Amino acid sequence: SQVDQYEDAIPVLQKLIEQDPSSKLAYRKLAEASKATDDLEKAAKAYEELFKIDPRDIRVAISISDVYLENDDYRLALKWADKASSLDDKVGDGLGQKGKVYYYGWDNFRQNPFTNDDRLIAKLAYDYFIKAERKGYRGFSKSAWLKENEKDILYGKAQWFMAEDKVK
């Protein structure tokens, strides 16, 4: 099976990296193989080593964020999305990744009925998606759905006026 092929490739890639610790391709392939075999921690570590070799590669920062997101580590997913958005503010990919992290966090932790915190996180996701799309981002986005359901989901004037003074 394909998983077996990935499992067989991992020790070979590790040996390659021992021989040439600057091999971007070997780190990328190790990360992909680790992800395919569901070893998300090893995948994240391989991507992080790749990022050390090429610390300006926004795609690698986003890949690291995605692996942490897949592993439900929202703190590290957001940290790497932040790093991605700080690398290049001309493209919206990093901002889109931040929107994605906030959206998945909201989707995973929201309560019924929504709390103000839930609404704030949904609003952050929406705002980052919109900022990203204005910069040409075309990746994962729930901005249209969030906008369509904003009265029910997003933090807005109704919640602001209902908030206690100490919150404002």
Predicted regions and their residues:
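TPR alpha-solenoid repeat register
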Residues: 26, 43, 60, 94, ...
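Canonical positions in the second alpha-helix
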Residues: 16, 49-50, 83-84, 132
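Terminal, low-structured helical/coil segments at or just beyond the last alpha-helical repeat
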Residues: 126, 131-168
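Short coil/turn linking the two alpha-helices of tandem helical-hairpin repeats
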Residues: 3, 69-72, 99, 104-117, ...
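Residue-level recognition of tetratricopeptide repeat
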Residues: 23, 56-57, 90-91, 136-140
